């Protein structure tokens, strides 16, 4: 299925649904989904546009089996606030 949207000429909805909006033909085999990467303008919706790292996020939680409850959600500051 082809549709012209921006620079892309392929329709590859990702792993959530197949080209018909269903899930019956996915991952059969798993490598079949990788063929969508061959299009030069292909970019999956699951890839983030930006990446933020928080090096101190896991401080004090050295043993993940015991300390996983210490890990908290990270809420970045909004732009312009200090």
From Swiss-Prot:
* One matching Pfam family: QH-AmDH_gamma
List residues modified as Tryptophylquinone: 43
The record places the cross-link (4'-cysteinyl-tryptophylquinone (Cys-Trp)) at 37-43
What's a Gene Ontology MF term here?
A: oxidoreductase activity, acting on the CH-NH2 group of donors
Q: Which domain of life is it from?
A: Bacteria
**Where's the active site on this chain?**
33 (proton acceptor)
Q: How does it get modified after it is made?
A: The cysteine tryptophylquinone (CTQ) is generated by oxidation of the indole ring of a tryptophan residue to form tryptophylquinone, followed by covalent cross-linking with a cysteine residue.
Enumerate the cofactors the protein uses.
Answer: cysteine tryptophylquinone residue
Subcellular compartments: Periplasm
Q: What does this protein do?
A: Catalyzes the oxidative deamination of a wide range of primary aliphatic and aromatic amines. The physiological electron acceptor is the constitutive cytochrome c550.
What is the name of the protein in this document?
Answer: Quinohemoprotein amine dehydrogenase subunit gamma
Origin species = Paracoccus denitrificans
